């Protein structure tokens, strides 16, 4: 198949792969945010928000050489009528590798395992989430939305790559921290009500901090209805308000409140 200096000419196989990935992305990730709480000694957290605007890059499509705009690629793909001629010479060199990783990405909520900072020399990437699938490990590079240091640690996924265990260690900066819990919500919802992943041991270790996060960012009624045993363990103390939580744990609650306050701004940034 012909190629130019930028990308390879798309064929039927590539178009069909993109259709399949887009339909899975629409079902599992588009319009969703995930709150990831992680850490061994100290619990930290970040939010990852997915939108249709992320799809083309994550799937290995060079938007500069595509014959239609990214939002048109996505719309036609989820409708099942994307054609090779729509894509032109937009198939990136690592397209096949990215499509393999993207299949695992669709199970993001239940397969993410670790979080780490990455080498600052890599353009604009300042966080990565390690994910273990049945056949591969990969990392999501993510841009921090907003420049204020005091703002919420919220990310938009920007890169996707398959990495060997050795490569993961080479690219990682500092400790790769295990994930304690992952919650999800639709972007039009204000609070988290679904638990996607749970590490029982870390949840027990960080119970006080986790309780403050869930009380601030979560829908307490919905969480209690869906996960009564877990919530009974976490909320067993008689908290009348967030002010009853220790000063240490309250820092996390305040950061969660900042996430809630800036959500509209964040989602506007993602839609551009």
What does each model-identified segment do?
Residues 1-126, 130, 180-272:
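An acidic, glycine-rich, mixed-charge low-complexity segment common to nucleic-acid enzymes
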Residues 135-200:
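Compact beta-sheet-dominated globular domain cores
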